[in-house]
Amino acid sequence: MNFTDTLKVQTSLSGGYDEDGNPIESIFQWILFGKEKNSIIFTNEKAAKVSLNDGNEYVYSYVIIAKLKKDLIPLIPREGQKVHIHKSDGTIDKEMEVKGFVTLKNRYLKIWV
């Protein structure tokens, strides 16, 4: 596989509550998942569906395949988390919500957005 696209994961740097119990607003930051050109982005041209954990089927917009290494496991985006995808040819540059993910042979991560 020729990995030419980029995947970034949105993570929260802070949040929680202050000493009076008031919520502290979270600050979000984009973290590169691995390195530049670590993923491949495919469009869902056939309106295929994926079954989610809640039992519903979802017609996804894109599927992303990314290289997975041990040090990237804490960065795996969870359902509902935002990711930023960028296709190397410039046709896709979007912020999307993760609908589901799986790991493949402990070497790759497959994400539906």
List each model region and its residues.
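Active-site-proximal polar cores
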Residues: 1-31
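Short, conserved turn/kink motifs that form compact alpha/beta structural patches or helix kinks used as
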Residues: 24-113
